[in-house]
Amino acid sequence: MSHAVEKIAVFFETLTPQSIERFSQFYTEDAYFKDPFNEVRGIPAIQRIFRHMYETLDEPHFVVTGRVVEGEQVLLTWDFHFRFRNFKSNELQTIRGATHLRLAHDGRIRSHRDYWDAAEELYEKLPVVGGLMRWLKQRANR
């Protein structure tokens, strides 16, 4: 399985809009995907999520920072770098997160679940919403 995990990590680190078409090499047909905004099943639905990423963000890319493999289960930690396309700030953004994968016997992904803090890692960086989120966080910590 470690060879399959290495291929998966390299695939995500080198992901492009064109390589999304190769998802069937890495996901089973009925693969499950969940992140803070989406919960879908099947390659076409997963491809739509990644296409949307490229349509709405500039320079999105993943850097895998760690991996733990236990049988068919994999935990990848990563940094996701991007620039907001529709905001004045052109500053490079980073979201830190983790992905729990469950692999099929052939090494393809049958379950992909992303974990990251949408409030801290995304909402707090948005104009208007970010100020509100930071204020709410301060109030909650009093």
Which sequence ranges carry the predicted segments?
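A generic structural signal for ordered secondary structure
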Residues: 10-11, 23, 50, 93-99
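Short, mixed-charge, low-aromatic patches
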Residues: 1-10, 35-36, 54-58, 110
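A beta-strand edge to alpha-helix "cap/lid" segment located at domain peripheries
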Residues: 55-61, 65-142
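Soluble or luminal CAZymes and related metallo-dependent hydrolases
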Residues: 3, 7, 45, 93
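Short, charged low-complexity linear motifs
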Residues: 7-14, 36, 64, 97
